[in-house]
């Protein structure tokens, strides 16, 4: 399932350092605005302790985790909606992603420049986040102002387009009050219509606080009602260079339970509205990705389109039952293996075997 989350932020907040640590790819991190020009794309494993527990029972040849795609997008500056800096490219790149991960600067460093007129000692996370949100809101207003005349004409010819036109008008007024589109109260019908408007502020958003090491345990104030995820990009970059044993020792010395990047990957997965189901056999134990609310045939189609086309049934064991009863045979003996049809909605952690015929 190809869904992506765009890493955005003002210049020099640590986006590329974070991306490099996440993906273990060499990105360009430099002390000047727009070090990132063309977006870098990386596939990141989503840590899931359930995989190893399944593997301990099945003893497979390999373990395959779920993944999420991160895109490192050029730093944004005030005026991006009018093309300032790399504004047009920034907005085009973020429009192609499914969610936003905004990195906000909490660290102080006189050697790492900020925008013109501010030193590296200046920290204003809420103001920085507001700058980016304002640019996204202004960009969305421009999008709607261009779309509305056309939508009005189309709605007069086709009554089915009236809901889209009406919600577009409401959204423009809402955005004009400085509020993001996603925060407007909408019916299910209106929300479905709004998706077709391709607004940036309809995308789900996650805030990451790039902090100094000694700030990681600080209680952070919410940004736009969302509690930021505390991460020290420098620490994460160092951890990414270590083997697993040395990394564990380093984490322990810092008093941290797990890398911040593991938490970020898991948070991004949830932000995208994703969940995992598992297949478990001698060859591999694998986490497969589906949207929350996916049916059994849709999940089967993630493995292969033939599985969805020829879906017959799904043999399902809940994850907890699978572990508690020692695997498939124990679950069968205890009556915990269920036969589910095409209307079954997948639960997170289901261990599944699909039956199909093509």
Question: Where do the protein language model's features map onto the residues?
Answer:
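Conserved G1/Walker A P-loop phosphate-binding module
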Residues: 1-84, 88-114, 120, 126
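C-terminal-of-GTPase-core extension/linker across diverse P-loop GTPases
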Residues: 2-8, 13, 19, 150-347, ...
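Short alpha-helical basic/polar micro-motif
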Residues: 16, 52, 92, 142, ...
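Short, intrinsically disordered, mixed-charge
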Residues: 24, 56, 92, 134, ...
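Active-site-proximal flexible loops/turns
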Residues: 27, 79, 135, 147, ...
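Phosphate/Mg2+-binding loops and adjacent switch elements
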Residues: 81-206, 216
């Amino acid at each position: 399932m190809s869904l992506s989350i765009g890493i955005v932020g003002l210049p020099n907040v640590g986006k590329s350092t974070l991306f490099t640590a996440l993906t273990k790819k060499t990105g360009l991190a430099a002390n000047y605005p727009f070090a990132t020009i063309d977006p870098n794309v990386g596939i990141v494993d989503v840590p899931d302790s359930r995989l190893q527990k399944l593997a301990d029972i099945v003893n497979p040849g390999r373990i395959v985790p779920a993944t999420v795609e991160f895109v490192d997008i050029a730093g944004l500056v005030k005026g991006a909606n009018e093309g300032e800096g790399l504004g047009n490219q920034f907005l085009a790149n973020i429009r192609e992603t499914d969610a936003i991960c905004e990195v906000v600067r909490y660290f102080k460093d006189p050697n790492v420049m900020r925008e013109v007129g501010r030193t590296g000692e200046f920290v204003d996370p809420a103001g920085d986040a507001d700058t980016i949100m304002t640019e996204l809101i202004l960009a969305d207003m421009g999008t709607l102002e261009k779309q509305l005349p056309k939508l009005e004409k189309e709605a007069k010819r086709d009554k089915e387009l009236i809901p889209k036109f009406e919600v577009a008008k409401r959204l423009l007024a809402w955005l004009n009050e400085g509020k993001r589109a996603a925060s407007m109260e909408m019916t299910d019908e209106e929300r479905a219509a709004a998706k077709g408007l391709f607004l940036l502020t309809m995308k789900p958003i996650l805030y990451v606080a790039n902090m100094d090491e000694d700030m990681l345990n600080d209680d952070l104030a919410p940004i736009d009602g969302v509690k930021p995820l505390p991460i020290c990009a420098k620490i994460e970059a160092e951890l990414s260079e270590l083997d697993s044993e040395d990394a564990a020792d380093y984490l322990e010395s810092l008093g941290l339970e797990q890398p911040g990047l593991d938490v970020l990957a898991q948070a991004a997965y949830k932000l995208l509205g994703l969940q995992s189901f598992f297949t478990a056999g001698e060859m591999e134990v694998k986490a497969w990705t589906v949207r929350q609310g996916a049916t059994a045939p849709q999940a089967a189609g993630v493995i292969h389109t033939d599985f969805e086309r020829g879906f017959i049934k799904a043999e399902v064991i809940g994850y907890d039952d699978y572990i508690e009863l020692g695997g498939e045979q124990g679950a069968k003996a205890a009556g915990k293996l269920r036969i589910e049809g095409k209307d079954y909605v997948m639960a997170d952690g289901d261990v599944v075997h699909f039956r199909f015929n093509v």
